[in-house]
């Protein structure tokens, strides 16, 4: 596996841009985790800014110690 779950504010990404993002992330995961391309899955969820607090409360703040890249902001 790994499964990567990207959450971000809405972006105007066309299918080509999404494919390029997925390819770049896949390359990094293969290089650093020695994964196979076929074992990697990537989700892209666009979250409205007014809903971000819920993501912070449920996923970011409780996992702060496990994050390998911590945000430069707090809520």
Curated annotation (Swiss-Prot):
Its EC number is 5.3.2.-. GO terms for cellular component: cytoplasm. It comes from the Bacteria. One of its GO terms (molecular function) is intramolecular oxidoreductase activity, interconverting keto- and enol-groups. It is an enzyme of class 5 (isomerase). The active site is at 2 (proton acceptor). It is found in: Cytoplasm. Keywords: Cytoplasm, Isomerase. InterPro entries: 4-OT-like_dom, Tautomerase/MIF_sf, Tautomerase_PptA. Belongs to the 4-oxalocrotonate tautomerase family. PptA subfamily. HAMAP family: Tautomerase_PptA (MF_00718). Homodimer. This is Tautomerase PptA. It comes from Shigella sonnei (strain Ss046).
């Amino acid at each position: 596996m790994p499964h990567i779950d990207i959450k971000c504010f809405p972006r105007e990404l066309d299918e080509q841009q999404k494919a390029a993002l997925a390819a770049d992330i896949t390359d990094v995961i293969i290089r650093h985790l020695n994964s196979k391309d076929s074992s990697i899955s990537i989700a892209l969820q666009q979250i409205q800014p007014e809903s971000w607090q819920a993501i912070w409360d449920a996923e970011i703040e409780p996992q702060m110690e496990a994050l390998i890249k911590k945000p430069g902001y707090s809520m």
